[in-house]
Amino acid sequence: MPFHLRSLFLAILISFATALLGASAQERRVPSSSNEVRLSYAPIVQRVAPAVVNVYAARMIAVRNPFFDDPIFRRFFGMPGGSGEQVQRSLGSGVLIDPAGLVVTNNHVIEGADQVKVSLADKREFEAEMVLKDSRSDLAVLRLKTHRESFPALEFADSDALEVGDIVLAIGNPFAVGQTVTHGIVSAVARTQVGITDYQFFIQTDAAINPGNSGGALVDMTGGLVGINTAIFSRSGGSQGIGFAIPANMVRVVVASARSGGSVVKRPWLGARLQAVSPEIAESLGLKRPAGALIASVSTASPAARAGLKSGDLIINVDGQTIEDPNAFDYRFATKPIGGSARLGLMRAGKEIAVSVALEAVPDASHDELVIASPSPFQGAKISNLSPALADDLRIDPGAQGVVIVDVANGSPAQGLGFQRGDLVLSVNNAKVTKTRDLERIAAQQSRFWRITIVRGGQQMSMELRG
């Protein structure tokens, strides 16, 4: 190489190295002022925090004074034995999702409340009325009692767009200390084995969520609402870095029903009983791993039957979204709007096929429902005849016979004895129960002894009570 070319090449190398060293030194030096480096969530918080509110619920509960059972006490004070009432208060959070004053919160925050008040970030307080509550998703929608005021509100973001590792902020009122903001990342986007609501599909985050945060907002870095904070996993009662939020796409469904004036949430139903895929089933189907939702049975005259679904079909996706287990299917299907159709990807006899299923609302069974009012173990339970749609909704064998408990009044004898939504009553005092009127008639007999047989979670159990 000629001397002048070697000199030019060497000069270029020296200049390049100097530039690298200068850049490296510049990157590693300590910033000379706070203006050079500013990492803050303040702009997002300032925009979204005014839409996060505190929710105060008050309910009257019956209490019995143990001294009233003492005959000497009653004789001395001239008071009959009995019970009194006291006010029980609970505190949670909520999110304004409409400038007109609609607030979404957790159902467990306001369950059984006789009075609900909402406190805004600017310290204003309003009474709130119940618009809709949905125990299945643990969501409720309130409306502030105002005179045409306009409120700050959050917009929904697409919770399906979240990815593990995304940064999120949790905003609420933990331990009643006042509005608090914590940050973290998305730890999981489809946590299904949580056991909180009927729809087992949650966003998991390590953002600190504590008692009082229930019903608060989980927002992304654009300020969009991606979830409603609902629960924590904790052995101490405080945050341990495992919090769960209901995805915004499920919240949308509940809010849409509230805006349309409905008192219940309208969701599509399939009409098929699903089961998880075990390692043994996966091996028999030739799958590499357990995944999907296996159809165990199909109800007659259901959307599933009309679509041609069969027992043994394996649902692997809904509109292209992968299905890992029956809980994931329930969530994906429940967040579809009524009307139109959904395309299910199936494995049938070792081949992949696609089937279109109509998105139909669950048939109204309200005319079959009644509340047991007679003094009995069932007092306060709302019961219904078991229909294919209700069996699908509660994951009960559609071929079963009996009367199902669809709701239990807060503080009722039925709740005190542990009856739950989804319990299938088979017999009472050796009398078979097949219709709601059967159970109503038996409950009115006011027996001193009760022998009750129910099915819960697929397991038959019996209980004996004296009263």
Describe the residue ranges of each PLM region.
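Conserved catalytic-core segment of clan PA serine endopeptidases
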Residues: I97-D98, K117-H147, F156-D160, N173, ...
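Active-site loop architecture of trypsin-fold serine endopeptidases
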Residues: R28-R29, S34, Y41, V63-N65, ...
